[in-house]
Amino acid sequence: MNPASFRDCKAWQADGLSLSTTSNEACKLFDATLSQYATWRNDESLGGIEGCISAMQKADPNFVMGHAIAAGLELVGTGSSLRLNERLAGDVARLVEMAAGQSLTPRERLHVSGVEHFAKGRHSEACEAWEEILLDHPRDMLAIKLAHDGYFYLGQQTPMRDSLARVLHHWTPQIPLYSYLKSMYSFGLEETRCYDEAEKVAKEGLEMNPQDGWAAHTVAHVHEMRAEMDKGLQFMASTEKGWEVCDMIASHNYWHWSLYFIEKGQYEEALTIFDNHVMRLCKASGSMLDMVDACSMLYRLEMEGVNVKDRYRELLQQTKPHTEDHVLLFNDLHFLMTALGAKEEATSRRLVETLQELAEAPGENLQHQLARGLGVPMCQAMVAYDQGDFGKAVELLRPLRYRFTGIGGSDAQRDVFQQLLVHSALKSDKKQHQKFARCLLVERDAARPNSLLTNRLIQRANALHI
């Protein structure tokens, strides 16, 4: 990144995105923070995101948008619960109070509103606030990226795609960060199963910027969803030098790489990626994305019959402190995978019980509202599967399978729960469940022809003489 390109007060104003501060230094550091967020990369020459935020708040302690981006990025990281983190709760409260006492632009007030909504678990309302900004300010990258992340957590694939479609024509290739609009739009296309267009748009982004880790990520998804394992392996190897510098997405891209090996039944190769990259980066970053990837990878391997118990125990040291966070159901379900895999019954029980308590009195928090009818029964199904009660797992998951999108994440990420349902049905001693497994596999084969993983499961079903 080129510090000389970061905008001062006048440059922000010239772009129609005035910031309520007189500090040019604060404005430039705001731009530096935003650029690193958009590019999935902590630039150590700038001090990384944390360093830029710290310097920005020193340059102007009363800069509302500086506090908004700081709180917003911590919140969308989903690693801190407002219920449990008094410092974060205080930061959000001070942001709202500071905004109330200043003369801000309507755009800035909407940003504060979006952060406050997200902090309180009102994710849909947060996205509405960011979309309101984009009606008048379609080149507000912070609103674009926060809405993109918000829709992702909500599992709202079509709004995630359309949010970018609405603003893209307002940008030109000469505007900094333009390629990242291509990559975000391509991901929305992929998640709405427009695979050809998604690949085309993502590769346009990569042509402009080979270090666009999110564009590479979209192509990885396309190959996964088409069951193009060899193409996926070749693509990841050929682009690794570009995206491995994006520390906030690199581990996730290695996770995608490993999925191709799991699909092919090459488990040792998958474990090598886990040990050399996924787990190493997870321990270094402590990020939720890196953690849930590691959880998911081990769970998939375990369902394939691979012994990963020792790795579960190591991973539990990362996930256990977040057992009672309950920020996202998606995170909770993945942390439960590791607690169960490590045979930590007390941790597993505590996670499910505390989630149940929140589900009984969810208030305005959307995730807690969804917990009662979605998150808790999914957790109970995982516990039942772990205890060998496969029939119960089927009965819990079967009514929910078309609602899995509600936990957020991508189709590729949520497929672990579809796989869990298939394995549960195959292992159940009830013939109707085994017949249901056959139907599920027919569905999988129709949606992703030539999937080696599906073929292995079909062979297992054939052995049952269903």
Question: Where is each model-derived feature located?
Answer:
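C-terminal non-catalytic interaction modules
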Residues: P377, Y385-I466
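Inter-helical turn/loop elements of alpha-helical hairpins
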Residues: T22, C27, S35-S54, K58-T105, ...
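TPR alpha-solenoid repeat register
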Residues: G66, R109, L142-A143, L177, ...
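Solenoid-like repeat scaffolds
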Residues: S54-D60, V96-Q102, E131-P138, R166-I175, ...
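A conserved active-site cap/scaffold subdomain adjacent to cofactor or substrate pockets
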Residues: I249, Y254-K320, D332-F335, L340-G341
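"A position-specific structural signal for the A-helix of alpha-solenoid helical repeats
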Residues: N24, D31, S35, I69, ...
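Single-residue signature of alpha-solenoid repeat helices
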Residues: S45-I49, L88, A126, M160, ...
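Structural motif corresponding to the intra-repeat A-B loop/turn of tetratricopeptide repeats
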Residues: T39-W40, G77, K120-G121, L154, ...
